Amino acid sequence: MKKRVLISFTFVVVIILILVFYIKIHNNKEEDVKINYDNIKHADIENIAQNYWNSDGIYNIAAAEDGYYYVTNEDFLVYFDINTGDTVPVCAKPDCMHDNDECNACLNTCVIYNIYYYNEYIYYMPIINGMANLCRMDKSGSTTKILGELFPSDGSSSIHLAFLGDYAYAYDSGSHLGLDTEFTEKIVEVSLKNGERNEIYDVTGVSLAIKNVKGFGDGLYFNVQHSERSDENISISSYGLYMYSQSEKNVSQISTENINDYYLSDNYLYYFINGQGLYKSDIENQKTELIYKSNKAVDMCNISYDGRYLYISNGKYCDYLRKVLGNKEKKYIVIDTDGKVINEISCADSLEMLFGDDRYLFCMGMGEDQLMYIDKREIEKAEEWKNIFSEPVHLLGR
């Protein structure tokens, strides 16, 4: 009986925490938002980095010219072509059978899941003597080069990368969020030419994380997020949107609003403010409008843009409010740049919502190597997900 009472009490406490969190988010009323346009109004936002992926999740997939790279559940890097159905390990070692950890495609000693494709090279982070390093691999997997050290890592840390010009930028997106110990969070810049390393930004505090780092034009944009938890309350908020200028070598604050995620394109800044919704700011004319309102099932959203439509994901929000919303409410909302809803696509069976490029929309299912996609040529009416792999990709010990 005591055990049953304890379980019931714990359940009630969890529900109260969730509801307080939900109410705190939605007490945020729509209001006039302030954007510092001075530092972004002349920005050339043409960019070749893959900012369309979900920068607040795992990076186990990267787009290439004709297909995609993917890290399997066995930590093997493979290349697949959706049109042909071909899947091959990314290794060109002579006589390699691709069935053990000596294979170049095996990434089991790296920061888990995170791979990137930039300017015709693959980038990942092997761990050497407890330190995550930046490594560059050619497209075939035949040659690799260590460019420089990043951060201490045990493999489970959430070190992410972003790219801009001739530099990679590394940051920890969540290892210390929710902890009671003070840490200094940093963004580290590494030259892709000579490996020179510089710390361009740092912030010290309890339960902080640098999030959603993306490069546009001359600027590297990012959030700083903070969480607080007590017996009665839990809150997650953003300190705003920041930009590091490569040319000026300084950091400025673009907004102090509670921005969860953002995207820049075609002289517009799109950003989602928690408790309010998705805003669109005209950088040239300095005008802002709310184009999509948040609601009880869609908030704290991540966003992406493929040159045609904006994509809104409520996956993180559903994860935080799992007891209230759960996976059944997970979805992508596809809207045009004026806020008109084009489609809503259920992601009830997804573990991770990845976004995608201009060809396909992706998510990770609950099963092993259950990478699923929707062809964006059918995005206006799409409802059902298709599996990339007919079965788990097992290479070890074949």
Region locations from a protein language model:
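Loop/turn-rich, solvent-exposed surfaces of beta-rich toroidal or solenoidal domains
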Residues: V298-G326, K330
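N-terminal Sec-pathway targeting helices
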Residues: M1-V14
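Hydrophobic alpha-helical membrane-insertion segments, chiefly the h-region
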Residues: V14-K24
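N-terminal export/targeting and maturation segments
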Residues: E30-F76, F216, Y262-S265, Y270
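Repeated scaffold domains used in trafficking and secretory/extracellular systems
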Residues: N54-A64, D99-Y116, S153-G165, G205-G217, ...
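Residue position within the beta-strands of beta-propeller blades
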Residues: Y70-V71, Y123-M125, Y169-D172, Y221-V224, ...
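Surface-exposed loop/turn elements that mediate protein-protein interactions on large endomembrane-trafficking
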Residues: H26-N54, F76-E102, G130-F151, G178-V203, ...
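Fold-core signature of tandem repeat domains
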Residues: I122, V190, L220, L241, ...
